[in-house]
Amino acid sequence: MTTTARVPILADSDAETVAVKAIAERWGLPFETTDNDVFQLWLTEGVLALHWLQSPQKMSPLVVDFHQGKAAYRAQNTQLKNEAIAKAVGVTGQFKPSVVDGTAGLGRDAFVLAGLGCNVQLIERHPVVAALLDNGLHRAQKEHDFIGDTCLRMQLIGTDNLFTGSGYTQEPDVVYLDPMYPKTGKQKAQVKKDMQMFQQLVGSDEDADTLLEPAIALAKYRVVVKRPNSAPFLAGREPNSQIKSKKHRFDVYIKRGFHESAN
């Protein structure tokens, strides 16, 4: 992963101070601002937002909100037959594999899998992104509706668990990876504003190839890697099968068939 930039967290009011300290302590974030800050996190009425202070164009703060936008619509209108990710992970009407999302990001793919009925444990290596995701999950989980119920099947467990192999509440059937991949030319122009901010903060996963082996070791049945159609195989390793969509493909590394004994 690209070196983490310094991003301070601030409270919008005195009432938020205790909560801000708890977030900062959990994710190792500083309180002090500097004149060189590129990003700042602000907690306002319980909502954590990332502000890009030096953005080339005016951008709204980045917030993880599972009740808004295309993610909410997609989760509520997902059909197994239309979801390439479901086919790759192995979701059926009768079988909902447990999943570890080792590169959770803003939680969007994990949210789709949870909407399909999977229990998903999330790992996000960037502490600022993890803090945003954690805040979004906790807010959503308080709501007694489909979105809230979906988010209850999502659990953010930490930042480095894929490499330590610890902290999981259950052994995952599937490990899912979607490492950041450098975009160039036309691809950059097509990236939406919220993802522009995300990519500026996180950069590309320069060590992405190192994720595959621990993922294979952890998964009970398979590892699924999401890649742009033009991208090479992760770690140069050819998958057992592929599921392709318009812009992406899902490379599937199979250890054994579902329900097949490990012995």
From Swiss-Prot:
It is found in: Cytoplasm. Keywords: Cytoplasm, Methyltransferase, rRNA processing, S-adenosyl-L-methionine, Transferase. It is an enzyme of class 2 (transferase). GO terms for molecular function: rRNA (guanine-N2-)-methyltransferase activity. InterPro entries: 16SrRNA_methylTrfase_J (IPR007536), SAM-dependent_MTases_sf (IPR029063). GO terms for cellular component: cytoplasm. Pfam families: SAM_MT. S-adenosyl-L-methionine binds at residues 108-109, 124-125, 178. It catalyses: guanosine(1516) in 16S rRNA + S-adenosyl-L-methionine = N(2)-methylguanosine(1516) in 16S rRNA + S-adenosyl-L-homocysteine + H(+). The keyword rRNA processing applies. Its EC number is 2.1.1.242. HAMAP family: 16SrRNA_methyltr_J. Specifically methylates the guanosine in position 1516 of 16S rRNA. Belongs to the methyltransferase superfamily. RsmJ family. This is Ribosomal RNA small subunit methyltransferase J.
